[in-house]
Amino acid sequence: MRSRNPFFYERFGVPDTVDGRFDMILLHSFCVINALNKQGQGGRELAQALYDVMFVDMDRSVREMGVGDLSVGKHVRRMMKAFNGRMHAYQAGIDNASLDEALMRNLYGTVTGTVDPTNLTIMGDYIRNQVAALNTMNPDRLMQGDIEWAPVPGAGIKQRAPIVEPQKTDQAVA
């Protein structure tokens, strides 16, 4: 639930919209999946399971927003494509300035007007800090989903992620 923290929207100018919230979910998912992928085969399998559960939930969310059954698959595929593109952009930019460019294009892409460059820098640093923290945390805790996020800069917020058991579903994501 870290991505829903109002601080990102109120202080750092992330749009408090469906798109802004979607991008915050993708950013935090990137951080976790990036760390899991470094934990060998078991980590890669868990990363894939997280991806699968995430998009089953996206499917449910799209339906709850009133998208018709015939269009849901198309919407979810578009979201998956967006996620995959962002994963590559964030991975490529984690060690350089192209992360800020990717954040500007994606996280702040729907902002009308000027994006405060300080917010962009803070968000880039925030993501880099999360990746570093997750890459150095105890692998057993990471694999159990016992994630401790690095603090949000300037917010004094440090948060543990609740361990959530995935719901079983018969739905397949197209």
State each model region's role.
Residues 1-174:
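Surface/interface-facing alpha-helical segments and adjacent flexible terminal/loop regions used
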